[in-house]
Amino acid sequence: MIILDEPYVSPELAAYAAARQEPVLDNATARACARDYGAALNLTPEDAFASLCREDAPRLYTCSENALDWVYAHSGNNALVERVRRLKDKAVCRERLAPLYADFFFRQVTLEELAALPFEALKVPCVLKPAVGFFSLGVHRIENAAQWEAAKVAVARDAALWREQYPPEVVGGGRFLLEEYIQGEEYAVDVYYDRQGRAVVCNILRHEFSSDADVSDRLYYTSREIIESRLNEFEAWFNRVNGPLGLRNFPVHVELRRDAGGRIAPIEFNPLRFAGWCSTDVSLFAWGFHSYGCFLEDTRPDWERVLAGKEGLLYTLMVLNKPENCPPVRDFDYDALCRDFGKVLHLRPCDFRRFSHFGFLFTETPADRREELDRIIRSDLTEYIQQE
């Protein structure tokens, strides 16, 4: 079963759903996809779809957390709703996992408490983020008093904008989480739990930053070397944390960090979906399979086969986020952007007047010739912006 919802449905997902005739909730977004993509979707009326959701551990995939509102209100499956809530609310998730991370500092505060909280009360370095959040919105790393005051101003300013762009089930501007900064390399993992609660990893992306202060989603990449070195270790960790989480037939997009000593700590679990917008399609462009297809068909990637001949290559996903204090934009030069990369696999422009980014770019880049990645991760993209 699939729920398609705003802000974006990739044509690959729509084509997959049509080819498989997966039950798709009949909503405005799904009807628009059927019309715009010419996809013969198996549109299923709400009552019938809700009946399928009430099965024990239904196999449900959403492309957007905007769909969570429907799950809460109409699925009629209290166990499913509880599992979603325990992941989506980062404070609740931290409390669930606390027995596994007894020395990990976190604290939940309201917007009003945040405004009055002095820097001296913090354990730094730390991270401030919405307790219910998405897409690195409202995430701030804090090391000093100036950063703390700037973060509080930014959060107060942006909370109203989040309410306009996302429902409260996706981004909440009323409660925030303060937690210790997790050291190590950051990864984004698309993983699902099968009917027995066993983890199946469908892709692993390294999340790279331009500096310690950077919290953006600009650059992710996967490779044969990343999969081979992290797959077994990460699956074992996912199986361990599922003890307190209790997930079955459940897809999750997980952000985590692994330090030099091999200690893995979660950043967040994003329920009922894989990487947001069209990001999970990197598995198709890199490895030739749909990540969501593995979940919906209850299959495990044949890594030995798909990794053959892929040595020395990085398969990237770049989020073309707007710079801070972005001037009014008349146009964005996507052609010039693509010319700056040796092999573009796919470009996904977005409505930059509506959203906080210009689109998504997927490339194949030799690991020993990654200058194009080092450049783009530090770029504010103004060289491609045509101002009004």
Predicted features by range, described:
Residues 242-278, 307-314, 318-326:
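Conserved metal-phosphate-binding beta-hairpin within the catalytic cores
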Residues 103-104, 145-183, 244, 376, ...:
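Conserved ATP-binding module of the ATP-grasp superfamily
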Residues 180-183, 190-246, 270-299:
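ATP-dependent carboxylate/phosphate-activation module, predominantly the ATP-grasp catalytic core
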Residues 296-388:
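Peripheral (often C-terminal) accessory segments that flank ATP-dependent C-N-forming ligase machineries
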Residues 2-18:
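N-terminal basic/disordered segments at the start of proteins
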Residues 29-122, 134, 365-380:
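Conserved N-proximal alpha/beta basic substrate-recognition cap immediately N-terminal to
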Residues 97, 122-142, 161-184, 189:
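ATP-grasp fold ATP-binding core
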Residues 126-156, 186-190, 210-226:
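Glycine-rich phosphate-binding loop of ATP-grasp-fold ATP-dependent ligases
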